[in-house]
């Protein structure tokens, strides 16, 4: 089992799919990495040599922000918005949609489960 960026890649999956298990690497980035290193898209992780795994690891470390660093950067960006007290920061702080979606109805994912209001009936 190959371990890249602190993630154990599933051995029975194709390299492109397995790389997407790493937070911060999607399909396009995985394809770009494979093309850069000359790895066939149909190869499985179990068929990779140790040298190829090392190449993938070095490429990801050098060119991409993944896993903990990416999560930390995202959290810091949100915290910065909240500290600035700008509109987006206030929406994050209140747990409401940030990008202009309506909240009179819907927005249940962001707001959480509906809270019953005592004495309100139709």
Swiss-Prot record:
Q: Which InterPro entries match?
A: Rbsml_uS13_C, Ribosomal_uS13, Ribosomal_uS13-like_H2TH, Ribosomal_uS13_bac-type, Ribosomal_uS13_CS
PROSITE patterns per the record?
Answer: RIBOSOMAL_S13_1 (PS00646), RIBOSOMAL_S13_2 (PS50159)
Pfam families annotated for this entry? Answer: Ribosomal_S13
GO terms of molecular function: rRNA binding; structural constituent of ribosome; tRNA binding
Region annotated Disordered, chain positions = 95-122
Q: Which domain of life is it from?
A: Bacteria
Task: Identify its protein family.
Answer: Belongs to the universal ribosomal protein uS13 family.
Complexes and interactors: Part of the 30S ribosomal subunit. Forms a loose heterodimer with protein S19. Forms two bridges to the 50S subunit in the 70S ribosome.
What is the name of the protein in this document? Small ribosomal subunit protein uS13
State which gene encodes it. Answer: rpsM
């Amino acid at each position: 089992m190959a371990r890249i960026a602190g993630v154990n890649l599933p051995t029975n999956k194709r390299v492109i799919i397995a790389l997407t298990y790493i937070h911060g690497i999607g399909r396009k980035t995985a394809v770009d990495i494979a093309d850069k290193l000359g790895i066939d898209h149909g190869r499985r992780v179990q068929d990779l040599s140790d040298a190829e795994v090392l190449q993938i690891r070095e490429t990801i470390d050098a060119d991409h922000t993944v896993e903990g660093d990416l999560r930390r950067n995202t959290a810091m960006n949100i915290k910065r918005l909240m500290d600035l007290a700008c509109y987006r920061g206030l929406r994050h702080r209140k747990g409401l949609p940030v990008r202009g979606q309506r909240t009179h109805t819907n927005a249940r994912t962001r707001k959480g489960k509906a809270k019953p209001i005592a004495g309100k009936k139709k």
